[in-house]
Amino acid sequence: MQGSLPWGSFLDAGTGYNSLRWVSSLDTERWAAVTASAGMARTARKAAAERLRSQDRVLVANWTSPELLYGECFDTVLLDYFIGAIEGFAPYWQEQVLTRLRPHVKGRLYIVGTEPYVLDAPATEEGRIVQAIGRLRDACLLLGNGRPYREYPASWVLRQLGTAGFRVREVRRFPIRYRERFVNSQLEMCLKQLDQLNDPALAQALRDRIEAQRAEALPYARSEQGLACGADYVIAAEPLDPGHHALPLPQHVPVDHPPAPQEAAPSG
């Protein structure tokens, strides 16, 4: 999707271990990585390790702040599973994120996401299991006073890109086969939330359900086919030319208005 375009200056708008490990391996002039979590910032710095240069930055900040990276533009901007994660840090802000980032995109914008799988009716047994894991995870997060991620479909992102002033260059979809790591990581997240519950009976019931779900899912995840369910997508976009931001105003023919009536002179 990048082709022969240079990476130039690079912004990882919602960084994590995997994304920054990849970004720091690219031939960039400089990069900035933003996260709202201090813990994730430490993890990201470890991912960059010795490849962290003096011109590179890891920032702990929230994109709801208008001062963040004010006046800076980047040749390449990456949103790596970022829109789905916004709910945990800036709920109800998803529709504004692309407009917020638009001034920082000089060249190419890449958006990576997952098609939602928690709400839609699954068509296969593997899909049912993946959905059950997602619903159990979200239920435990809510009971533990957390906020579940909220994935958005590619169709929603494409509409928002147009509204925010971007032209879509390419869309690719990649079918997902979930493996053992996914099952265990999601269910371990569930277990961590149980410490927040004040109801021991409910916590034990959920713990039993978590382990039953693990026992059901792992044979599928360990098989050659894995848990085939849904797809990831990658969208490449770029800013519209300034002349394309709005349609030209219609040309109106001037109309001669009749003169205003004059007041009659007082008689007498």
Q: Where do the protein language model's features map onto the residues?
A:
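C-terminal helical/coil "lid" or tail adjacent to the Rossmann-like core of SAM-dependent
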Residues: 175-221
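Conserved S-adenosyl-L-methionine
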Residues: 166-177
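Conserved class I S-adenosyl-L-methionine
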Residues: 110-136
